[in-house]
C-alpha cells in the first residue's frame, strides 16, 4: 500500500507502540516491518493465530523472556573460515533453550486443536546436534567446560596444580623474608599470564626480580620475584596450550552450527515470530483490541471502534459505530468543527490498515471489515510554499495522481476536499469526484462542510450521510455518529467556545440573517432528535443485553437443575434394580419404588389447561391433538379399542396415551403439526434412534442388549408406559435374549409378541410400570 497514505493515517506510530511490547530488538524490528496484506486467507489465518495465542497465554500463563539479537551471528557465519567465540555461542545456546521451552509449552495445541499454532510448530525443525553440543561444552556462565575435551581437561588440571605451587612458594617467600610491609596487598595477582606481587614502588630496589607494570597512581609496581620466573614460563606455555585447545573446541562447535545453520536460523525466527505474537497480545490487552476477520464483498460493521492511539490515553475516547452496508459505497460525514469528523475518517483507515496487517484493532467482537488491496488518503493541509502549491492545488494533484489506480478494491479517505477554493465550485468538484468513485466501485469515507454535498449525500443512491453529534445544551462535540442525517458546522459556537469576541460574533449572526443562510435552528433541532434517538437506542441495547444475560443465566440454571434431577432419578432406578437383583426387595416393592422415582420428574400435579378433552370416539387416525398433561402437540397414528388409548406421534416420539388426556389444538397449530408429521413420514427414520420404539435387527446379542439397557433408562426418564422392541424373526436367538432381559427387569409390568399385522413374532410389545 502507498506509504504516504499509511503515514497520514499514523500507521507507523501504531507499529512503534506495538514494538514497545516486544522483549527483543529483533521482535521490535519485525513489528516495525509489518505491512497490510491483500489476501483474505492470510489475514484471517493471522487473526486466528492471534486468537489461539491469546487462549494459550490465558490457559498457561506463559511469558517469553528477553533474548539477544542473533542476526549478526548468522551473518558472520556466511564467511567459511570465521569461528564464533564463546560469548556468541553462549548467546545462541541460551536462545535455543528459550525456543525449546516455548516449543514444549506450545505442544498443548494438539490437545486443544489449535490448528494455526500447530502449523507454527510444524514449521520448526530442531537443531538437536547443535543444541546438545553447546550444552555439553558451555557452562551456565558461558565458559568452556573442562570436560569439553580430554586434552583441555589435562591442561587445566596442570594449570591448577601449577597455581597451587606458585601460591605456596609466594606465601613461604613473604613469611620467610618478612616482606609483607613491602607489599600493597597480601595476595598474588596475574599480569600477562605471569604471577606477580603488588610491591610498593619505593621498595622495588630491595628485592631481586622483574617489574612488569605500574598502577595508575604509580605507587604500586607489579613485581615478579626471580623464584617465580621458571614457574611463570611453564604457566605461559600451559595457557598457550589452553587457548589452542579452546580454539579447537570453538571451531568444532562453530562447525556444528554451520551444519544445522537453517535449523538454528529457523528456531531463532520461531522465537522472534512468537515475540511479535506476544506483543500483539499485550497491545490488545492495553487498548482492549480484538482480531477482526475480513470478508471479501462484505460491508463495514465496526462496533465500538476507537482510535488506537487515543484508546489508551487518559480519559479514553468515545467509541464509534461505523456502518456502511454492501449496497452503499460512500459515507459523507458532516457536523461541527472539532466535532470528530477527521478522527472518524482516520479511525476507519487506520483500523483497516491494522486489520490487514494482522494487528488486533480496538473494536467489539463480531465486527466485520471488507477486504481492500489499496488505501489512499487525502487529508490535512498539504500546501507547500517552497513549491508554490496551495491546499486546494495539493488536493487536486493528489487525486489526479491516484485516480487511475482506484477501483472496487480501493478504500479512499477524503477529508474536506475542495475546502480551499470557492464553496460553490469546490462543492461541484466534490460531487463530481464522488460520482466518479461510484462509477468505479470505490469505497469512500469523506468529510465535508459543503451544504450542497450534504444534500447530495441524502438523495444519491449508493451514498449515505452521517453526522457527528454535539450536546444541544453545551454545544460541545459528543464524538458519536448519527446516520442518514446531516449536521451543522456550528462555526459560531466553536468560535464562542474559544473566546472569539462577542461583538464580532453578533455581526456574523446578522450577516447570516441578511444572507438567509441561518438554518441553524433547523439543524439544531435535527441534532437534538438524533441525540435523543441515540440515547434511546443505547438504552434499548442495554436492556436487551441485560435481558439476554438474564435469559442465559436462567437457561443455564434450568439445565443444571434438569440434569441434576435426571441423574438423581437414574441413580434411584439403578439402586432399585440392584436391590431387586441382590434379592433385598421383592418385585412388587421394586415396581413401586421405580414408579415413585419416575413421578418425581413431572410431579404429582398435572398442568392446568383450559382445553376440553376428547372422547375416545372423537379421535381419528391422522388427527392433530394436544397432549393436555404435557402441553405438547402430536398426531394420532393408531387407536386401541380395547384399552381406550391412542398412539400419538410427538416430534418423532410415539407413545400410547389415554384418550381423556387428549384435546384439540388451534387451527394454525393443526396445520403446522400435520405438515411436520407428513414430512417425517416421507423420510426413513435413522436406525438406533433412542425413541420409544427401538430396532435391534442385525446387531449381535451383546450389543443389542447394551443398547436396550440404555433405551430403558431413557424410556423411564421420559415417563413412557409402552415400548416396542423390533428384534426380527431370524433364528429367534435375539428374541430370546430380549425376553430374558425383560424377565429380569423390575420396570416391566408385562410383555407379549405383537399382532401379525404389526410385526408378529418379529417385535415385542412391552408394558412398563
Swiss-Prot record:
Its Gene Ontology biological processes? mismatch repair; negative regulation of DNA recombination; rescue of stalled ribosome
Q: In the UniProt record, does the keyword Membrane occur?
A: no
The gene coding this protein: mutS2
The Swiss-Prot or TrEMBL record describes its family as follows: Belongs to the DNA mismatch repair MutS family. MutS2 subfamily.
Name the chain's protein. Endonuclease MutS2
Please verify whether the record's keywords include Signal.
Answer: no
Give the protein's function: Endonuclease that is involved in the suppression of homologous recombination and thus may have a key role in the control of bacterial genetic diversity.
Gene Ontology molecular function, alphabetical:
ATP binding; ATP hydrolysis activity; ATP-dependent DNA damage sensor activity; endonuclease activity; mismatched DNA binding; ribosomal large subunit binding; rRNA binding
EC id:
3.1.-.-, 3.6.4.-
The chain positions of domain Smr read 694-769
Name any one Pfam family assigned in the record. Answer: MSSS
Which keywords label this protein?
A: ATP-binding, DNA-binding, Endonuclease, Hydrolase, Nuclease, Nucleotide-binding, RNA-binding, rRNA-binding
Concerning PROSITE patterns, the annotation shows: DNA_MISMATCH_REPAIR_2, SMR
Task: Tell me how this protein assembles.
Answer: Homodimer. Binds to stalled ribosomes, contacting rRNA.
In terms of InterPro entries, this protein maps to: DNA_mismatch_repair_MutS_C (IPR000432), DNA_mismatch_repair_MutS_core (IPR007696), DNA_mismatch_repair_MutS_sf (IPR036187), MSSS (IPR046893), MutS (IPR045076), MutS2 (IPR005747), P-loop_NTPase (IPR027417), Smr_dom (IPR002625)
Which SMART domains did the record assign? MUTSac, MUTSd, SMR
**Protein residues bound to ATP:** 335-342
Q: What enzyme category does the UniProt record give?
A: hydrolase
